[in-house]
Amino acid sequence: MTRAGEVLPGFAGGTINLASAGLGARALFATDEFFGPLERMLKDEPAAFHPGLYDDHGKWMDGWETRRRRGAGHDYAVIALAAKGRIAGFDVDTSHFTGNYPSACSIEACHSAEDPDEATEWVQLLPVTGLGPNAHHFFAAHSDAVYSHIRLRIHPDGGIARLRVYGTPALDLKAMANETIDLASCLLGGRIVAFSNGHYGHERLIAPGRGANMGDGWETRRRREPGYDWIIVKLAARGHVERILVDTAHFKGNYPDACSLQAADLGGMTAECDMLVASSAMFWNELLPHRKLSADSVHEYGSDMLRHADPVTHVRLNIYPDGGVSRLRIYGRVADPRSR
């Protein structure tokens, strides 16, 4: 059990939240949602508490909350993950639930092309485990299998503020061998490994869709010294870059003056080597030369503007001198494993 604001456990390193509504996770079914709908449990922002806020059902709580049971049994909910993936662990968060949290929970998972039904076979990833009030509860999952859906059981009833499912998307390289894909997409396995500054956030730079507002992207603090800011993305797969998109949506008085990109083929470097990646990036080959940017616009750069045709595994986006970028897309094809 860990209080809000504490450091994430080791198993969460190099993962994304597969249960993020912002990435596309969906609430499919709940046995009861009297005090709070299941969708709230999948929200990306930390749970909030409003002491004086009530609705027609009683005290408004920022999470999924069921009514008090007066008989045998327990409540459960089914969630479609944002992407099929390998699950590293969970955060069952009872923030602000002090007298109405479940006594325990358990979690199961399945792999299904369709939404689960009564015939679906589930695998238990977390046995019945006790919960406490107003706290993050981190549990590691010990499985290398790929799953698409989660079933959270709460015993016997109560409220869960947030459920985080930390994992890595499972990319079917063979199925995508001849397709142009966004190699940087976090839903395919792309991930941010390092950045110079992320004062106003960075995680959503490689998220799906266009940014909803100025807080939905990567933005640095105002630079008061010489230099520029940068961010490094490990691609979902080693690939040939064909087209780049830099989107400054909603950044109007704080967009970068210009950008450039560098790239490298670093082979199969794992998350444990991320610190080494950052120190070597200044020497990487130029992929996109210095280009001017404009406010609240989509900037596309085709193959005729790119200077590096070899396969790459990592890219570094440089912004001059600072500012915000909503989305970065690196479109290309997965490289043949035999190519150099």
From Swiss-Prot:
UniProt enzyme class: hydrolase
Concerning Pfam families, the annotation shows: Allantoicase
One of its GO biological process terms is: allantoin catabolic process
Superkingdom, taxonomy of origin: Bacteria
Tell me its EC number(s), please: 3.5.3.4
Does this UniProt record's set of keywords contain Transmembrane helix? no
What is this protein's name? Answer: Probable allantoicase
Extract one GO molecular function annotation from the record: allantoicase activity
- For the keyword Hydrolase, the answer is yes
Q: Which family does it belong to?
A: Belongs to the allantoicase family.
The protein's annotated pathway: Nitrogen metabolism; (S)-allantoin degradation; (S)-ureidoglycolate from allantoate (aminidohydrolase route): step 1/1
What is the species listed in this Swiss-Prot or TrEMBL entry? Rhizobium meliloti (strain 1021)
Q: Which UniProt keywords apply?
A: Hydrolase, Plasmid, Purine metabolism
Q: Which NCBIfam families match?
A: allantoicase
Provide the catalytic activity annotation.
allantoate + H2O = (S)-ureidoglycolate + urea
